[in-house]
């Protein structure tokens, strides 16, 4: 029996996958619990149309992410912070601070998509970070942490 999954199912597949299962598993568990629907010809047609639309939207997201990554590569990012003796910061620079600095430069991104190498920053200097615009578009960049003048 072939079914189309409506939700992700462990050890079976992801949403909108067409999978072959045993008749009892499909009829007695997957379909009644709302995890799947029977793969009728009309359901297959709807699935193929849905997948086409999703692929088109996904490509648009990838193109937009690539533009953002290109924009990021051309930027010089500097974050100013108060520092004490030995270039040690009062506090630390986090993903949120870096997201705010990027927003000022025109790159809007949520802080959860930023990964600073080595964790939070506690000293002045140059650091590397990774920005995940999309699961297929990842950009590495450097930024400077400078003291208040």
From Swiss-Prot:
GO terms for molecular function: rRNA binding; structural constituent of ribosome. It comes from the Bacteria. GO terms for biological process: translation. Gene3D superfamilies: Ribosomal protein L9, C-terminal domain, Ribosomal protein L9, N-terminal domain. GO terms for cellular component: ribonucleoprotein complex; ribosome. The keyword Ribosomal protein applies. It holds the Pfam family Ribosomal_L9_N. Transmembrane segments: none annotated. Disulfide bonds: none annotated. Keywords: Ribonucleoprotein, Ribosomal protein, RNA-binding, rRNA-binding. Belongs to the bacterial ribosomal protein bL9 family. Binds to the 23S rRNA. This is Large ribosomal subunit protein bL9.
